[in-house]
Amino acid sequence: MTNPVYRSARAAESIAAQYRRVLERWPVARTELHVPTRQGSTFVIACGPETAPPVVLLHGSQANSAAWMPDVPLWSRKFRLFAVDMIGEPGLSAPVRPDLAGDAHALWLDDVLVGLGLSHAAFVGTSLGGW
């Protein structure tokens, strides 16, 4: 297995299964999306009023969108949240890890925004997601 995120297919499957169990406890109603990008599929959790201002949430390294669960109940009252599983991290997005020194992540994020139909949005990021 050549996967820059996990040491084995078994580890990848185990983490994905545990993550799905955690997502079952997402604190508000949600929609799970799979957005095609040039880096592969990107997993996004959308929640909050569909007509509310959009906010894109980008977690840090060695994390996934579950990191936002404590914040979601409050923020989703006034905003349409899009919690994006960053590529190359232990979530449900493509297990690719492009070089951080290039423009691959910026182009990937452009693809995500286009796939979500967002021409503008506010961003909240932590660690790696804060660029």
What are these regions (language model features)?
Residues 30, 40-42, 65, 81-84, ...:
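Generic alpha-helical hydrophobic packing signal
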Residues 83-128:
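Active-site loop/oxyanion-hole signature of alpha/beta-hydrolase fold enzymes
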Residues 33, 57, 94, 98:
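Generic anion/oxyanion-binding catalytic loop in active/binding sites
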Residues 38-40, 61-64, 128-130:
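Short beta->alpha connector loops
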Residues 1-54, 78-79, 118-119:
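Alpha/beta-hydrolase fold catalytic core
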Residues 17-21, 67-70, 104-111, 131:
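Alpha-helical elements of Rossmann-like donor-binding domains used by nucleotide-donor carbohydrate transfer enzymes
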Residues 15, 43-91:
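Conserved HGGG/HGGXW glycine-rich cap/lid loop of the alpha/beta-hydrolase fold
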